[in-house]
Amino acid sequence: MEGKTRPSLAAVWLRELRAPFFVGTLSPAVFGAVYAHYTGVPFNWLLFALTFIGTALTNAGLNMTNDYFDHRSGDDYLTPATPVSGGSKVIQEGLLPPRQVLVAAILCLVAAAGIGLYLNFVTGGRVLLAVGAVGMFIAWFYTAPPFKLGHRSGLGELVCVLGCGPVIALGAYFVQARQFSWPAVAASLPIGILMGLVLFINEFHDVHADGAVGKRTMVVALGTGMSVPVLLAALVATYALAAVLVAAGVLPALASLVLVTLPLAGFAWLRARRFHADSARLLPANFAIIGLHFTFSAIVTIALLLS
């Protein structure tokens, strides 16, 4: 920090929270609530606001937990700092002590759990309780021992797909509709797959650091070159699944407009195929996948509102 102006405490905490990445969890939360409205359920704004806040708090807890345990493993000391990967680096730069980050993570998760318990009390049943328990488990044990879900090839990516798709969407749906819905689960899968791809392509940048500390992500297991066909297959599966959901009436016909996002998907794949081993040149592909996830999610959600 010598020769540099130390940022304000507020700026440091904003950086630690990594709020822009909340889109990955808030998108399925909004989608799930809107899907309930699409099926004829009156929209409850208060319950939606609590769902939204609880989801954001869980995401904040997850981000800070990841930073803390990646600090403990040494991973974030080795990962290159990019806009999309490598953690916040606030611990590594001495801006916050690790213990403060851990305490803040616990406080966020406790607050989220409190909101979840209240929503479960209001809505009744056990579905929301189960969804919340799964969410808390993922948020803590994604990088924390003994499970370290994100360190296990394929499992970390699958957890991201399910957690940032069906799990959150079903929870948000249940808060509004107070019943389980397989269509809501199925309809949210494309959003979850795309969020899984955001994580997956980010792993390309960290492949050497992750491998050095025993964090065996799918990209570490396959290598960046062999991971590119996986990226393509997942992109194809996303659009194919969306088409099936529209054809089956699970999503409205307007949701077919997600096809306008195909250029983003194509660009991301072509860029990854060419520059999978070049972190700096790969970055546009990362931004394309992030944009694809946001745009795709927005289109299907707006399609529900207009149908």
Task: Pin down the residues of each PLM region.
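Topogenic membrane-insertion module of multi-pass membrane proteins
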Residues: 1-46, 50, 54, 146-151, ...
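Small-residue-rich segments of transmembrane alpha-helices in multi-pass membrane proteins
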Residues: 23-32, 158-173, 219-224, 287-300
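Membrane-embedded alpha-helical segments that form the functional core of polytopic membrane enzymes
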Residues: 40-66, 130-137, 182-201
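Acidic (Asp/Glu-rich) catalytic motifs at the cytosolic membrane interface
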Residues: 57-82, 197-219
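Multi-pass membrane catalytic core of lipid/isoprenoid biosynthesis enzymes
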Residues: 79-122, 219-251, 290-294
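Intramembrane alpha-helical segments
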Residues: 87-179
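Functional transmembrane core segments of multi-pass inner-membrane proteins
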Residues: 159-207, 213, 225-229
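Extended hydrophobic alpha-helices typical of membrane-associated regions
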Residues: 247-307
